[in-house]
Design a protein with these regions (language model features):
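DEDD superfamily 3′-5′ metal-dependent exonuclease/proofreading module
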Residues: 1-152
């Protein structure tokens, strides 16, 4: 799992403005600032970024920042799609929010990034346990789809 950084952005519902940014490298080094410039420095030369629902949520805010800075965008791994693929028996695939005990308490993007990292580790273990034929079937069907391409 080397060289993956897990990212989470907190965005206001009414203005769609990023209000908090968190990230965790695969070696567990955290980042917690509301600065895209500093996030890009933290992500410098990282080949992969990951997150839970990163393709449909966080990437829409991150992509313009990479373009604006003239930076290469890392490849994307979305733990949400891997979760539904590797844990089909689960009723839902959202990250647990057990650290959010009060209804009005805002999400912590560093905690969510760490949860994505831990989920990805579970997903890797689940994939390794799959029958080799099922791995080949998954590869044949999914190796060129944006949602799970990076697994292969």
């Amino acid at each position: 799992m080397k060289d993956i950084t897990f990212v989470d952005l907190e965005v206001t519902l009414n203005t769609c403005r990023v209000v908090d940014i968190g990230a965790v490298r695969s070696d567990r080094t955290p980042f917690h600032e509301n600065s895209f410039d500093n996030l890009l420095l933290f992500l410098h030369q990282v080949p992969y970024i990951s997150g839970h629902n990163i393709l449909k949520h966080d990437l829409s805010y991150l992509k313009p920042q990479f373009e604006k800075a003239g930076c290469r965008q890392p490849k994307i791994i979305d733990t949400l799609y891997l979760s539904s693929l590797l844990f089909p028996e689960k009723l839902h695939h959202q990250l647990s929010k057990d650290d959010k005990l009060q209804a009005d308490k805002s999400n912590n993007p560093v905690n969510d990034s760490l949860k994505s990292l831990l989920l990805f580790e579970e997903e890797q273990n689940a994939f390794e346990r799959l029958d080799s034929m099922l791995k080949m079937i998954y590869y044949g069907l999914l190796h060129d789809t944006d949602r799970v391409r990076r697994l292969f």
